[in-house]
């Protein structure tokens, strides 16, 4: 809790107001963080694409969001090289998308899987935001 008086015991309303505003912002950040769906390439250069998806997820956290990157999660126990398991992973991702406030699409290349996810998000009426590989928002 911010103190109304300074170290010398005098009233300091300016500092008090500033500290109260900071405390309010910090409390608001703890109270609510929207969930965003991270959409980025996975297949191909899996190692590089995984590192990029982790970087994009970190960017979302630092921006005050809760990132969900299904291609980082489901590939831990589903084989992306097996069509049935890949389709199952995409199905799971679509289910999770329903719980997300927005979809964030990263990179300048849209893979087949990303295209399906974007179409689904569009169909569901989700807000879709596009970002470069360096996490700068771009228009499409």
Predicted regions and their residues:
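Catalytic phosphate/metal-binding cores of nucleic-acid and nucleotide-processing enzymes, i.e., regions
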Residues: 1-140
């Amino acid at each position: 809790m911010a103190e109304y008086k300074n170290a010398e015991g005098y009233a300091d309303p300016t500092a008090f107001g500033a500290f109260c505003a900071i405390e309010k912002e910090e409390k608001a950040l703890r109270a609510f963080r929207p969930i965003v769906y991270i959409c980025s390439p996975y297949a191909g250069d899996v190692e590089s694409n995984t590192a990029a998806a982790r970087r994009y997820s970190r960017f979302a956290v630092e921006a005050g969001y809760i990132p969900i990157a299904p291609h980082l999660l489901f590939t831990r126990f589903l084989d992306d090289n097996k069509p049935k398991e890949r389709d199952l992973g995409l199905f799971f991702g679509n289910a999770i998308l329903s719980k997300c406030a927005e979809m964030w699409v990263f990179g300048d290349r849209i893979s087949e899987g990303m295209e399906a996810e974007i179409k689904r998000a569009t169909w569901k009426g989700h807000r879709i935001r596009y970002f470069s590989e360096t996490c700068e928002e771009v228009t499409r």
